[in-house]
């Protein structure tokens, strides 16, 4: 009996909340008559999208080599009432799960499984993103693609190893973030202690070559015509305001302010500290504009 009364009370409360407060709303029409377009009918409510994010690493063991698993799970996603999926097609290693003239296909990624922390390899050759597009749209799902943007490699913890463009191609070291450390400027590719330095190796957003490379990747991704493209990690790296203090960033900043920085980096921020210099505010504006303009 108490349960029935509680349900009835909850229903009454919901009804009160849903119907109350209309008297205080500002009318949107110019009058109440039929001739001037007035009326009391409310527009039909638009259904809000419901998203499922399909992380590459988190689902790699199940999806990397199995179209059947993708079909099975997308059917469940649809039956549960979701409207959209977001497919991660460029995880933190920087390698990709779609076809591109400039990107390297993702062949392995570090995962946690029942067997522990290990590498999971992809041996399949079918198009990962296109499979999600095909199978998702058959079910009436919208399919969005997501990339980790300013990333170029990943250093694994526990001595598992590393993966990514920055590790394969030594010439790309100049693309990596340079931090304003206590002892001076340090390229993050020189920080390789798997206990202290593990994680994503970011690219420098102010490097023009980096931007051109990523725009080429995005151009290839757009050819798939996904319902949306999401730019994850479209930012400076996890060292925060310590990055990026590379020669390329200095050049671009001086172009931004229209003059030379006499004492770099001290005039922006003293090495290894958060003590601001004379150009600190303009430096932050430059960083924000770099991401915005990209």
Give residue spans per PLM region.
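Bacterial Sec-dependent N-terminal signal peptides
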Residues: 9-46
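Hydrophobic faces of well-ordered beta-strands that scaffold small-molecule active sites
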Residues: 50-54, 85-87, 143-145, 229-232
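Aromatic- and glycine-enriched glycan-recognition loops and surfaces
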Residues: 62-80, 111-138, 211-212, 289-293
């Amino acid at each position: 009996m108490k349960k029935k009364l509680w349900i009835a009370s909850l229903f009454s409360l919901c009804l009160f909340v849903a119907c109350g407060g209309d008297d205080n709303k500002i009318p949107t029409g110019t009058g109440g008559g039929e001739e001037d377009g007035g009326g009391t009918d409310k527009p039909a409510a638009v259904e809000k999208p419901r998203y499922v994010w399909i992380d590459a690493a988190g689902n790699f063991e199940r999806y990397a080599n199995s179209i059947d698993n993708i079909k099975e799970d997308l059917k469940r996603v649809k039956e549960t009432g979701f409207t959209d999926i977001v497919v991660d097609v460029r995880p933190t290693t920087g390698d990709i799960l779609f076809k591109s003239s400039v990107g390297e296909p993702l062949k392995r990624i570090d995962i946690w499984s029942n067997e522990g922390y290990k590498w999971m390899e992809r041996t399949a050759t079918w198009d990962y993103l296109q499979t999600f597009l095909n199978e998702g749209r058959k079910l009436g799902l919208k399919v969005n693609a997501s990339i980790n943007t300013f990333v170029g490699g990943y250093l694994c913890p526990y001595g598992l190893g590393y993966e990514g463009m920055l590790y394969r191609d030594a010439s790309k070291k100049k693309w990596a973030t340079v931090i304003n450390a206590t002892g001076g400027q340090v390229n993050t590719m020189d920080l390789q202690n798997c206990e202290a330095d593990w994680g994503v190796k970011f690219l420098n957003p102010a490097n023009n070559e980096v931007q051109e490379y990523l725009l080429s990747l995005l151009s290839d991704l757009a050819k798939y015509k996904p319902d949306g493209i999401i730019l994850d990690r479209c930012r400076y790296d996890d060292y925060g305001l310590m990055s990026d203090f590379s020669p390329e960033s200095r050049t671009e900043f001086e172009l931004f302010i229209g003059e030379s920085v006499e004492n770099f980096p001290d005039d922006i921020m003293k090495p290894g500290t958060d003590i601001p210099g004379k150009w600190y505010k303009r430096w932050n504006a430059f960083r924000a504009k770099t991401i915005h303009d990209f």
